[in-house]
Structures are given as structure tokens and as C-alpha cells.
Curated annotation (Swiss-Prot):
Keyword DNA repair set for record: no
SUPFAM superfamilies: Histone-fold
Name assigned to this protein: Histone H3.3
Source organism (scientific name): Tetrahymena pyriformis
Described purpose of this protein according to its UniProt entry: Macronuclear replacement variant which replaces conventional H3 in a subset of nucleosomes. Nucleosomes wrap and compact DNA into chromatin, limiting DNA accessibility to the cellular machineries which require DNA as a template. Histones thereby play a central role in transcription regulation, DNA repair, DNA replication and chromosomal stability. DNA accessibility is regulated via a complex set of post-translational modifications of histones, also called histone code, and nucleosome remodeling. Functions redundantly to H3.4.
A GO term for molecular function: structural constituent of chromatin
PROSITE patterns reported for this sequence: HISTONE_H3_1, HISTONE_H3_2
Subcellular location: Nucleus; Chromosome
Lineage, top ranks: Eukaryota, Sar, Alveolata, Ciliophora, Intramacronucleata
Amino acid sequence: MARTKQTARKSTGVKAPRKQLATKAARKSAPVSGGVKKPHKFRPGTVALREIRKYQKTTDLLIRKLPFQRLVRDIAMEMKNDIRFQSQAILALQEAAEAYLVGLFEDTNLCAIHARRVTIMTKDMQLARRIRGERF
């Protein structure tokens, strides 16, 4: 049965209490087995769609700042030992890296949809990078 939207109604007064059936009364008085309420389970994909909408609304950075900063410094150490970064430079690198990754995942998703799939695979990412003209 389809769900319908319920609207508020005016109450016309107090109704007389009804007599409960014996089975309902027995059910209410019986103790709940275990006493632990099971957590609510959402259908597969519901939480994923909610997360997609949430992250599409926000403009903040998705990668944590300190781990990204450590990664940048680690990569820079391989090129030169004593290199310093302004905080704005690391933020600019992070913005650029996240913009690149978001675009790559969008193209990867289009490749998966083109192959009549909804799940992205490594071959989709390889195809997206190849079409873009990037090296492996």
C-alpha cells in the first residue's frame, strides 16, 4: 500500500475509551524479549545517496589538512631536504588536488555508466585518464 501524506485535523472532542481485546492486552503486558532495541537498517544505497547529496552541497575540503600536509612535505623531501611551505601554498595544493580528484571520479563514473554499470572499476579510471591524455 502506498504511503500518503497525513494532514493535521481538528479534534472533535474526547472519545470514550474502547475495551482492549484480550490478545492486545496480553501483548502489552508481556515483557519484551531481550530488552535491546535493534538499530534501524536502511535499504542498500539509501545512505550512499544521502552522503552524495551531503557532499555535493558542501564546499569545504574533504581530505584532512594535517595528513595532506604530511604527504606534501614527504614528497617534497624526496626532491630537496630543507624546503618550507606557506600555509596558503599547502591549502592551494589541497584545493587543486581535490578538484582534480573530483573531476577524475566524475569522468570515471561516466565511463562506468557508458559500460552499463553503476559500480566504478579500475578499468574505468584508466579509460578516463587515457581519454584525458594523462600518462599512467
